Amino acid sequence: GGRVLPGSAATADVLPEIADAVGDRVKILVDGGIRSGTDIFRALALGADAVMICRPFLISYYSGGTEGIVTYVEKLRAELTDAMYMCGARCLSDITRGMVREAR
């Protein structure tokens, strides 16, 4: 996990540029750094078609078995739903880049 090269750009920093370059010709799957429902929201807003999550699921499983995974999924769902509600997105396809902005 993590970026391979020190000083490499974070996924979220380059995602909009990649999404603009490929348009609808390629599905964009984002992996790395996705830990919360708000991370999912941000990735979708910046141009991802889907996100992939592994490490948090493994941690959830090792610490709580199947129940740990269920709890983690419920947390992701609640956070994503809250972010969508606060930004006026009724469904995933309503999420747009204009709903997030770069922190300075």
Regions found by a protein language model. Name each.
Residues 1-8, 57-62:
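Glycine-rich, proline-tolerant flexible connector loops at the mouths of alpha/beta enzymes
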Residues 13-31, 35-104:
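Alpha/beta catalytic cores of nucleotide-metabolism and tRNA/nucleoside-modifying enzymes
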